[in-house]
Amino acid sequence: MALLEVSNLNTRFSTPDGEVSAVNDLSFEMAKGETLGIVGESGSGKSQLVLSIMNLLATNGSRTGSIKLQGQELVGLPNRRMNSIRGNRIAMIFQDPMTCLNPYLTIARQMTEVLMLHRNMDYRAAKTHSLQMLDAVHIPDAAGRINRYPHEFSGGMRQRVMIAMALLCKPDLLIADEPTTALDVTVQAPIIDLMNELKAEMDMSIIMITHDLGVIAGISDNVMVMYAGRVCEYAAVHELFKRPAHPYTRGLLSSVPRLDIAGSQRLTSIPGNPPNLQYLPTGCAFQERCDERLAICSQQQPVLQAHSPGHLNACHLEHGS
């Protein structure tokens, strides 16, 4: 049985100007112990996908389809039962550690609350376990710092605290939404190394959302490329980097500086901007930015199909249309 099964997921938002389609008929599976990287430009639907999994959509949002965690259906689950899963079986690290911690509460208060809610621990036992987790994420002098407030920590240390909080209950699935974006480059690599280390120790699965293809290469087993709320390509990480099949994926990779290629190389960019999700074009959403488009691209939405074993691609070029 897969750890996570998402089938035909659609996420919509009602606005004064009409309905916005953030996630469109999206399906994928994750195995236990797998790290899935999700990449795409801003507005591609990455964050709304995981917020749909967590049932943390804005009040004007709705979702349809199926989301199963170890066979348990999450769509339609009462809030009380979903609250017992969030922070327990599924945990999430949000993008900005500067704003996700409550500035009015000590780190001890914020961490012990999680264990007192989900593990029915008393305060003393919860604090002891919280200290152990702060040590696990390499917070120096954890015993002396646990009673401090978030503003007394650097950005990198705050992100380590967020990771520690997310892992307190040893979740089956950890969702990390741009966990390194707000951090200095020198701090990003140790955070990724830490997540790899903790994943191996706890035998958990990770969904890693990021714009950074270097982060994807360093942590992922498989990669899902999203564009305009849809999956346009899915493959094992090494396969995707060596043999990208979709024009959008190739565009993303060609825009990244390479250190493994001798001599100078001109970086290319993808022309234009992502489409307005409220007014998606007929056919392929990438057509207006693609220099390889065919006539059928403006008429018919491409289907995600096998490019090679384990490698899926949604492109009319690929399938000889």
Label every model-predicted segment.
Residues 168-172:
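A short, proline-enriched helix->beta-strand linker immediately N-terminal to the Walker B motif
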Residues 62-73:
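Conserved ABC transporter NBD signature motif
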Residues 3, 12-25, 56-62, 78-81, ...:
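A short, flexible loop at the N-terminus of ABC-type nucleotide-binding domains that lies
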Residues 175-179, 183-265:
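P-loop NTP-binding/switch modules centered on Walker-like glycine-rich loops
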Residues 73, 125-144, 254:
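Conserved ABC ATPase "signature" region
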Residues 236-321:
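Charged, flexible cofactor/metal-binding loops and thiol motifs
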Residues 74-91, 109, 117, 239-244, ...:
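ABC ATPase NBD coupling module
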